[in-house]
């Protein structure tokens, strides 16, 4: 754990009490029973995980990034409107409308523009998402989302988009380690 941070440690009491650790406790997620497989999103039992990813380094201005957040938010919120095959899941999804709008390329963005700009974009982005959720939820006649943002250790998806994964720096140097899993039957 001291070497690379693995395995991660999560405290359920903190998860249930806080949306963001920067903000006061709100206890919105008091029913959380666990997490999705990568622990990006707290979930109730039977709840689906609805994540969407944004790329900080693809934007030259905060206003442009906020525009991307709008469409990322709308996509994720729309997914919460779709029924699944399980009534238990549908009931929870309708109650929570939980989404996870995330940022990738965080470390590289901080290197490029500085930590204070990153913090500003994160705070402005969070506030923007909250405003969208309030307005669109009211317009749609549905509940506001119990959670709207996440820290998502993206991995392969971000690399395919040319970004560093999650909060990690882009691998540098001649060699780097990357864990890859595939089936024993795969011809690779």
PLM feature spans:
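Function-dense linear segments that define catalytic or interfacial modules
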Residues: 4-113, 179-183
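Short, solvent-exposed secondary-structure capping/transition elements
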Residues: 60, 118-119, 169
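Catalytic or ion-translocation cores adjacent to nucleophile or general acid/base/metal-coordination motifs
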Residues: 164-188
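Short glycine/threonine-rich loop-to-helix capping motif typified by GTGT followed
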Residues: 99, 161-164
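Short amphipathic alpha-helical segments
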Residues: 64-68, 121-128, 183-187
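Internal maturation/activation junctions in enzymes
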Residues: 80-90, 105, 110-153
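Generic beta-strand/beta-sheet core signal
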Residues: 10-13, 52-57, 149-154, 158-162, ...
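Short, well-ordered loop/turn elements at secondary-structure boundaries
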Residues: 2-6, 44-47, 105, 142-145, ...
């Amino acid at each position: 754990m001291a070497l690379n941070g693995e395995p991660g440690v999560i405290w359920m009491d903190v998860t249930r009490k806080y949306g963001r650790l920067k903000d006061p406790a709100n206890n919105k997620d008091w029913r959380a029973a666990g997490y999705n497989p990568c622990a990006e999103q707290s979930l109730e039992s039977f709840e689906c995980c609805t994540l969407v990813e944004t790329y900080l380094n693809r934007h030259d201005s905060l206003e442009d990034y906020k525009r991307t957040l709008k469409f990322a938010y709308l996509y994720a919120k729309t997914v919460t409107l779709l029924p699944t095959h399980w009534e238990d899941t549908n009931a929870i999804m309708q109650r929570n409308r939980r989404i996870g709008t995330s940022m990738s390329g965080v470390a590289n963005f901080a290197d490029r523009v500085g930590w204070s700009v990153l913090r500003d974009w994160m705070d402005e982005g969070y506030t923007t998402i909250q405003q969208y959720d309030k307005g669109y939820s009211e317009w749609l006649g549905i509940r506001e989302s119990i959670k709207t943002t996440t820290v998502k250790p993206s991995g392969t998806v971000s690399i395919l988009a040319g970004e560093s994964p999650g909060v990690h720096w882009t691998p540098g140097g001649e060699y780097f380690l990357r864990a890859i899993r595939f089936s024993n039957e795969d011809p690779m």
